Amino acid sequence: MCIRDSVARFARQERFRNRIVLIEDYDIAIGRLITSGSDVWLNNPRRPQEASGTSGQKVILNGGLNLSVLDGWWPEGFDGTNGWAIGDDRVRPDTPESDKADADALYSILETEVADEWTRRAKGLPKAWIKRMRRSIETCSPLFTSHRMVRDYALELYR
């Protein structure tokens, strides 16, 4: 069974209806649209499975905030004020208990921090959200550039 068929099978289940989107033929143009239109970029692969996280880096340049596991680039980029981290950086076994711990951490952050900052508004503006956006741009944009990516690949991968 291919991935598309598996996703379609899950998406038909009542508990997943209207909650799963599979983007076929994902390319640069689609990636540009998604990263430019996201307020929060959720990235939750199993640690340590994140390849790099360039989509999360692009979101920052568009004013989006990252809500991610501490893997890939995020352990270096996250400082506690410029987005949100899901759980800690421990690599856990692939078990239902690990999934539950990650899910609990994600829902807790969404309910107590993300939603609160987005909905709490002074004079119509989410001041805490805007502060976090600015902090994200200020702290991450200078660190994660295409020049650095090429340099890192050249130094670490192609030695």
Question: Can you say where each PLM-predicted feature lies in the sequence?
Answer:
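Short, small-residue-biased leader/transition segments that mark boundaries at the very start
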Residues: M1-I3
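Catalytic binding pocket for nucleotide-activated donors in carbohydrate/polymer assembly enzymes
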Residues: D5, T35-R159
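Active-site donor-binding acidic/aromatic loop of nucleotide-activated sugar
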Residues: N18-D27
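Short, conserved catalytic or adaptor-binding loops enriched in Gly and charged residues
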Residues: R9-R15, E76-F78
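Acidic, amphipathic alpha-helical patches
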Residues: I30-G31
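Secondary-structure boundary/capping positions in well-ordered alpha/beta enzyme cores
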Residues: R17-N18, W41
